[in-house]
């Protein structure tokens, strides 16, 4: 089964992608991992991507699609894969579908882990990081033994700029702008499945397993 995971930053799609990969023994593929592997191995595609990245430029969609398609043709993907973080836009989705079709392949499911913005802002706003060792906590879900103090090294905990409500909301606005058309695209294709991401992690996963029918 070939699966694409959709969901806003902080919705938990990465966690679910890992759980799917483990249960069905298929690779969990992120574009970041693909970039790092190709650059490390000095592949032609990796070197092209590195040229853009070294200049602080976005890697063009065509090149990202080439990298993804190259990855999903590898032996460990013969029984399927979970794509996490790609595609992000309709042009990327169209290019991916076209490239897969040329190989006689297609995406089976696009699973949207749906969480309201307010929940995500609260989730991410509760994160704390240690100024000393970098350990991460959550005020509600993973609190420290002593409030505001790291369990590991005893240093102070801070709210990172990335987790501040106004920053999170900006990221969510960008996500919705880019991804709502993508959700519409996969709805028209008849492969979009939506799960409630506000419930317990294991309940989210159970809903996904039910969708996948195994």
Model-derived segments and spans:
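Glycine-rich phosphate-binding loop of ATP-dependent small-molecule kinases
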Residues: 1-214
């Amino acid at each position: 089964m070939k699966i694409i995971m959709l969901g806003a930053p902080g919705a938990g799609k990465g966690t679910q992608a890992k759980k799917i990969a483990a249960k069905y023994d298929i690779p969990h593929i992120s574009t970041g991992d693909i970039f790092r592997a190709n650059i490390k191995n000095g592949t032609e595609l990796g070197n092209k991507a590195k040229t853009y990245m070294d200049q602080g430029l976005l890697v063009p969609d065509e090149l990202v699609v080439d990298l993804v398609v190259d990855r999903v043709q590898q032996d460990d993907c013969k029984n399927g894969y979970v794509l996490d973080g790609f595609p992000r836009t309709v042009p990327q989705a169209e290019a991916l579908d076209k490239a897969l079709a040329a190989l006689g392949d297609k995406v089976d499911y696009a699973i949207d882990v749906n969480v309201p913005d307010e929940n995500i802002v609260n989730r991410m706003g509760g994160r704390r990081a240690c100024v000393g060792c970098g350990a991460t906590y959550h005020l509600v879900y993973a609190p420290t033994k002593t409030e505001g103090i790291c369990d590991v090294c005893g240093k102070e905990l801070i709210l990172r700029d990335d987790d501040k409500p106004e920053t999170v909301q900006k990221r969510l606005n960008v996500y919705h702008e880019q991804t709502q058309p993508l959700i519409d695209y996969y709805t028209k294709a008849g492969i979009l499945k939506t799960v409630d991401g506000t419930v317990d992690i294991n309940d989210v996963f159970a809903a996904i397993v039910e969708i996948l029918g195994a």
